[in-house]
Amino acid sequence: MTPASPLHSPSDTVPEHSEQPMPESADATEAATEPAKPLVVIKIGGSTLGEHDTSLKDVAALHKQGIQPVIVHGGGKIITEWMDRQGIRAKFVRGLRVTDAASLDIVVAVLTGLVNKQLVNSLNNLGVSAVGISGVDGGILRAEIQDPELGLVGRVTQVNVAPIQGIISAGLVPVIAPVAVAKNAQMLNVNADVAAGEIAAAMSASRLFMLTDVEGVLDTSKRLIPRLTERQARSLMNSGIAGGGMVPKLEACLKALGSVGETHILDGRRPGALLDAYEGNARGTRIG
């Protein structure tokens, strides 16, 4: 796959570029012949965070096998709990959280603080050196207001992969909270599924895994659908069979298809789900 450029807009195509001459050296030759680690983007859903030990053990196992994980996390369940404590009622439109100014303060605090650091701490305890950041750091996620009906919710307009690449180059695992920044410096809440899809596409990841609290995409009889074409996925969304929080997951997977090797929606509650999927034994839904 073509290496990711530092700045990537969702509508970008990968430009052709000429090779730049490099000085001859033993170190340069060794670096050039060393194969790049397969990069996978893993979205850990807020609904599975209370039971995320197995998923993180899978992440640690993949990392030890020479695979480079980039983690994007949600935190919806915990955000709702903290909003309830403040007497703020959570509202959703088309599976996306409505975010006003008061809600945004809680979203930013919970995602970038509590949830992010819990995940980083857990990974560190599993022997994985992880660093917690958000889409605001280094301008990783640039966004604009997605829909006035949703309030301070962002549509990603640009992904700056340079800070992520820097963390990876240092031998660390990035753990990213989905908060973005607009041109006017306003922070915006970004759906974690959307953020994961945009980051996976910008980095030309080999795989995109969405971990959630259901088996995968289900049909009208609540049976798991092992694989969906783009047309089938859109039909399920248009008919309402796939609704709620599954819609942004499917849309993110579909949008990433042109740049990502494979996209999967998996049950993050099932022990070994992530490892099985990477080894070709997925029990969720593959998109594309």
Q: Which residues fall in each region the model found?
A:
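C-terminal catalytic "cap/lid" subdomain
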Residues: T2-G288
